[in-house]
Amino acid sequence: MDERLVSSELDNHESAIEQSLRPQRLAQYIGQEKVKDNLKVFIEAAKMREETLDHVLLYGPPGLGKTTLAAIIANEMGVNLRTTSGPAIERPGDLAAILTALEPGDVLFIDEIHRLHRSIEEVLYPAMEDFCLDIVIGKGPSARSVRLDLPPFTLVGATTRVGLLTAPLRDRFGVLSRLEYYTRDELSEIVIRTAELFEVDIDSLSALEIARRSRGTPRIANRLLRRVRDFAQVLGNSSITEEVAVDALERLQVDKLGLDHIDRKLLMGMIEKFGGGPVGIDTISATIGEESHTIEDVYEPYLLQIGFIQRTPRGRIVTPDVYSHFKMEVPNHD
């Protein structure tokens, strides 16, 4: 898969940069107002009762701030954050080692929690419900179960695919919060904040121009800002003006809706070779040279969100909005 500026997934080399940009408190966190307001109440109530916060499940598309919120929850509660991920916990013993190392009140963040193996989930159930760990010592007829007490802790799980969570695991979370795509104004505010951290001058129109092409996702907005900053420093006077921003984004082939060359390749392939559809996902895959699951998981979600593609029983079709965007006539199929 080609590297994409508009991918909402985190590149390995971006981790340190993202870490430096993350807000530390709810008051600094831009957007997700309903989620923030509810978390503020739950956190304050837990602190007033001197209890741990209920387990929290954060779900929604990638790049919207789930990891950031987990760290903020720990900061607001005044406790340590322990971080791991579903794929990193390969055996029940791995989870047991993590749980027994927790201090009272700690926040344990498990990213991609939907990828936990079922056998590991079963170890997690009593830990979440009763703060205890059941381990089996020995093998065969002499094997016996021993229960270990754990310190009270808060589990924060994050997932982009909440439908893959088992019902027993999902039901053990007391707080379930869905993160939504950001508005253009919220993204513009994030761009301005990030520019300040980068010590780069930017005006409001330039920030809006970057925001409108960021697909509702802060991670993409910050990535585009970094690339626009490069153009401003090399080709301009280091300040980001609207003219510099538009020129840079056009050079980067990210259009006014945030579509890139791969989006255009997919959409134009459907139009030019299949009359706009309906066309099956496997056929699209063969046409543009991408795996079917990559199209479904990476490319389609945004195109569905903005109404450029529809799924039908007979396959995918492009909508009239696509023809309008590309300044093409809508074909008459009558």
Swiss-Prot record:
GO cellular component, one term: Holliday junction resolvase complex
Chain residues that bind Mg(2+): T67
Keyword DNA repair recorded: yes
UniProt GO molecular function: ATP binding; ATP hydrolysis activity; four-way junction DNA binding; four-way junction helicase activity
Record keywords: ATP-binding, Cytoplasm, DNA damage, DNA recombination, DNA repair, DNA-binding, Hydrolase, Nucleotide-binding
Main location, first listed in the record: cytoplasm
Binding of ATP, residues: L21, R22, G63, K66, T67, T68, E129, D130, F131, R172, Y182, R219
The enzyme's E.C. designation: 3.6.4.-
Pfam hit, one: RuvB_C
Enzyme class: hydrolase
Stretch list, region Small ATPAse domain (RuvB-S): 183-253
Region (Large ATPase domain (RuvB-L)): 1-182
SMART domains the record matches: AAA
Keyword ATP-binding (UniProt): yes
GO biological process: DNA recombination; DNA repair
Subcellular location(s) per record: Cytoplasm
UniProt note: domains: Has 3 domains, the large (RuvB-L) and small ATPase (RuvB-S) domains and the C-terminal head (RuvB-H) domain. The head domain binds DNA, while the ATPase domains jointly bind ATP, ADP or are empty depending on the state of the subunit in the translocation cycle. During a single DNA translocation step the structure of each domain remains the same, but their relative positions change.
Family listed: Belongs to the RuvB family.
NCBIfam families assigned to the protein according to its UniProt record, in alphabetical order: PRK00080.1, ruvB
Name of this chain's protein: Holliday junction branch migration complex subunit RuvB
Species for this entry: Bacillus licheniformis (strain ATCC 14580 / DSM 13 / JCM 2505 / CCUG 7422 / NBRC 12200 / NCIMB 9375 / NCTC 10341 / NRRL NRS-1264 / Gibson 46)
Lineage, top ranks: Bacteria, Bacillati, Bacillota, Bacilli, Bacillales
Gene behind the chain: ruvB
